Design a protein with these regions (language model features):
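Glycine- and acidic-residue-biased ligand/ion/polar-headgroup-sensing regions
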Residues: 1-17, 113-114, 119, 125-157, ...
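Extended, compositionally biased flexible segments
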Residues: 1-44
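A short, polar/proline- and glycine-enriched secondary-structure boundary/capping micro-motif
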Residues: 21-22, 54, 62-65, 130-131, ...
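Conserved metal-binding segment of the jelly-roll/cupin
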Residues: 26-46, 56, 151-173, 179-183
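Short, structured patches in soluble enzyme cores that scaffold and shape functional sites
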Residues: 37, 45, 53-58, 94-96, ...
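Secondary-structure boundary elements
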Residues: 42-48, 100, 135-139, 148
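Double-stranded beta-helix
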Residues: 48-89, 144, 179-213
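A short glycine-rich, His/Asp/Glu-containing loop-to-beta-strand
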Residues: 81-128
Length: 213
């Protein structure tokens, strides 16, 4: 998997050539290329650029996919709930439904300033990696991992390797983007998360949030 963060790349693969560009991870949709082990890809930087590259073992094959704004599933989650305290923009590129032969699910989430995400707190069996970007270099937030809390800054990363809740929040004034990637287990793919039971009352559309009575 190649995912462009910013800049311009030329990708050469399977007798094809694609030029992908991205000004930043906040204003532009994700662009990148997912390919299997049988495909060779040449990456040429057309200017100063930054991209992420991920790989994992997989015996299955699937068609090479070039991602852009036309084939990324974008959903605003948390809208209209909890006084908009967990509103975020989720950009799913691949999950088990989209490509069951891929053994990774991945995408991006953009936290609006001062908002929470991965909320209500949830957990899952499969390992997950987060890579964070902020719209300003001094931006910061917090990532919860079970009972531990970690400060996150621009280009921080968190590895979720245990079945623990992992909500996160960004400070007021600072937008936060994080790339997330989940590795399926061979006989237990990630198809969704398990909510932390004690917080499920928040899913009631009629729940009262203080100072409501």
């Amino acid at each position: 998997l190649i995912l462009l963060q910013e800049g311009s790349l030329t990708l050469k693969y399977e007798d094809k050539e694609a030029i992908i560009t991205r000004s930043n991870v906040f204003d532009d949709a994700p662009v990148g290329l997912q390919f299997n082990k049988q495909v060779a890809v040449e990456v040429i930087a057309n200017e100063d650029s930054e991209y992420l590259c991920f790989q994992t073992e997989n015996d299955k094959t699937y068609p090479t996919t070039l991602f852009n704004k036309d084939n990324v599933v974008v959903v605003d989650r948390g809208a209209g709930q909890w006084n908009e305290c967990a509103t975020r923009n989720v950009r799913t590129m691949v999950d088990y439904k989209i490509n069951p032969n891929s053994n990774i699910a991945f995408g991006e989430t953009v936290n609006y300033p001062g908002k929470w995400s991965t909320f209500i707190p949830h957990l899952h069996d499969q390992p997950e990696l987060y890579y964070y970007r902020f719209n300003r270099p001094e931006g910061f937030g917090a990532s919860f991992y079970g009972d531990n809390v970690y400060q996150i800054k621009d280009r921080s990363y968190i590895c979720v390797t245990e079945k623990l809740a992992h909500p996160q929040v960004t400070a007021p004034g600072y937008a936060m983007n994080y790339f997330w990637i989940i590795r399926h287990f061979d006989y237990n793919p990630w198809t969704g998360a398990e909510n932390v039971k004690e917080h499920e009352w928040l899913l009631d559309p009629n729940c009262k949030i203080w100072p409501e009575k």
